UniProtKB/Swiss-Prot annotation:
Function as written in the Swiss-Prot or TrEMBL entry: Resolvase catalyzes the resolution (a site-specific recombination) of the cointegrated replicon to yield the final transposition products.
Protein name per its UniProtKB record: Putative resolvase R80
GO biological process, one term: DNA integration
Entry similarity comment: Belongs to the site-specific recombinase resolvase family.
């Protein structure tokens, strides 16, 4: 949408002085055209559309997501939080204490809700499995599609073959089910 206006009208619409418009033109902040007589016409429509896009971006959140599996790992959770705050001081921290297989986590649900609302700029995780052992690519797609955001994995496992990744996923699943079985056995023996 481009709507060109003279200096007086443009300054009235934008709420700035005509000299300010002239400075913005010199800096390239607003598009202008010149009439044959040399009068400047300002593209107020495009300027307002650009500002609207910028304000939408300003409302998007940058999030650091941290997670541990159990309350006994709270020390690790605190280390993750400390690391993320140091490396990403302007990000919001969202934390969970729950299994990576459990997709019904309070923090994860909040991230999904924010993504669907289009309010996520980026989500930073230490490792992919901190966000989700299974379904990482689904969450990534939600964030990309609805929020035009991204997931940043800080510590990637370099040059991992697909077979190695599959074996690692299977080991994660086995560990979770073993821990659940041993945990339930522990309580039944009491």
């Amino acid at each position: 949408m481009s709507k060109y206006m003279g200096g007086k009208e443009a300054s009235s619409v934008l709420g700035v002085h005509q000299r300010t418009l002239y400075q913005w033109d010199k800096k390239g902040w607003i598009k202008t055209i010149r009439t044959k007589g040399g009068k400047r016409l300002y593209d107020v429509g495009s300027y307002l559309a650009d500002k609207d896009e910028e304000s939408k971006e300003d409302h998007k959140l940058s999030i650091c997501y941290v997670r541990v599996s159990s309350n006994s790992q709270k020390d690790d959770l605190e280390r993750q939080i400390k690391f993320m705050k140091k490396k990403y001081p302007n990000h919001t921290i969202i934390k969970d204490i729950s299994s990576g297989i459990n997709m019904n986590r309070k923090g994860l649900n909040k991230i999904i809700d924010l993504a669907i609302e289009g309010r996520i700029k980026e989500v930073v995780v230490a490792y992919k499995d901190r966000l989700a052992i299974f379904g990482f690519s689904l969450i990534e797609r939600l964030i990309e599609t609805y929020s035009d955001g991204k997931i940043v994995v800080v510590r990637k496992k370099e040059n991992q073959e697909p077979q190695e990744e599959l074996i690692e996923d299977m080991m994660d699943v086995m560990n979770v089910f073993t821990a659940r079985r041993n945990g339930s056995r522990k309580y039944s023996n009491k």
